[in-house]
Regions:
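Carbohydrate-associated surface elements
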Residues: 154, 175
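N-terminal strand-loop element at the rim of the active site
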Residues: 5-11, 23-68
């Protein structure tokens, strides 16, 4: 098959899962075309089955905000015709499902029918999509998708509760390719991060308020008073600078390492003894799954789709 995948090309869970799905489909000898505004961060290898098509938005002074949706839908139309695309798979409802629908209708005018799968990931529903300015468009886009999937039962329930959805929603959980982490344990150089006596605690996120970054630091501060420990903070976002200041104010600056964004998540997790995920809201919690595959127990909040991933008393513990 010729498959077009539309996603955000960033370090967030939706972009990571979309990229990993495309890579897996390419290994099955499908032709996979990623269509977005820059090459996805996890897409570090293009080959005869994986293609990237950049969406460019020309600057025009009349527009206060450049119309990415129009550029994306036009790019989709061109790609479907040029590469004989069989199916569109759009990840994250805003604006991808809406742009996908526009592309479908333009193609129908030329007698071309292209099915569209929309995968809902979380904040596209619970935060951004639920805003009154976007809600009608999100509802319309979901209802006019051919197939709709959600990454968790919790997100499916939220979608049906918040929107007037007529389409059936199938739950397809996020996944990780276990084969890519199998050698990390023998290559792990834990001594670079901490002494033998110290425990290593890790947090990975986009450093937004919903991730409760300040609580991560408070939790670690309590732990390090009882147990010699280091905290690894992986990611970038609006609370990064504030988190660095708080670590300094708490007097734990020398015990906290800020990595920024990284494509070497597995190599960082192999150092870790514990993974913290105290999110206020989480539709799945891909970072927790990444920790588990690296044999790291997870302590997380008991919210959203996290209990579907982190099984209390099995893979870690849930906290109220």
């Amino acid at each position: 098959m010729n498959i077009a995948i539309v996603c955000y090309p960033t370090f967030g869970g939706s972009g990571v899962v979309a990229t990993e799905l495309g890579i897996a489909l390419a290994k099955l000898n499908h032709q996979v075309h990623f269509i977005t505004y820059k090459q996805p961060v996890r897409l570090d290898l293009l080959n005869q089955n994986i293609h990237f098509h950049e969406v460019t938005v020309p600057e025009y002074p009349l527009f206060h905000y450049q119309p990415y949706e129009l550029a994306l839908s036009s790019k989709l139309v061109d790609s479907v015709k040029k590469y004989d695309i069989d199916v569109l798979h759009v990840h994250y409802a805003i604006p991808h499902a809406y742009a996908g629908y526009m592309a479908k209708k333009m193609l129908e005018e030329e007698g071309i029918y292209i099915p569209m799968v929309t995968t809902l990931h979380g904040t596209d529903i619970t935060l951004v999509g639920n805003h009154p300015f976007y809600k009608p468009a999100v509802t319309f886009s979901i209802n006019n998708s051919d197939i709709v999937t959600s990454v968790s039962e919790s997100l499916k329930e939220d979608t049906l509760r918040l929107f007037d959805i007529k389409k059936e929603i199938e739950v397809v959980p996020n996944f990780i390719d276990v084969s890519v982490v199998k050698n990390n344990f023998t290559d792990c150089q834990r001594g670079l991060m901490a002494t033998e006596e110290e425990r290593i605690i890790t947090h990975i996120s986009n450093f937004r308020p919903v991730k409760r970054i300040m609580d991560v630091l408070d939790i670690f501060n309590t732990i390090q008073k009882e147990i010699p420990s280091k905290l690894l903070m992986v990611g970038e976002g609006p609370e990064r600078l504030e988190a660095e200041k708080k670590a300094k104010d708490l007097g734990i600056k020398n015990k906290v390492i800020f990595f920024g964004n990284s494509n070497e998540i597995d190599k960082i997790l192999c150092f870790s003894d514990l993974f913290l995920l105290p999110s206020e809201r989480e539709s799945f919690g891909l970072a927790a799954l990444e920790a588990m595959i690296n044999r790291v127990p997870v302590i997380s909040s008991n919210t959203g789709g996290i209990p579907e991933v982190n099984i209390n008393g099995v893979s870690g513990f849930l906290s109220e």
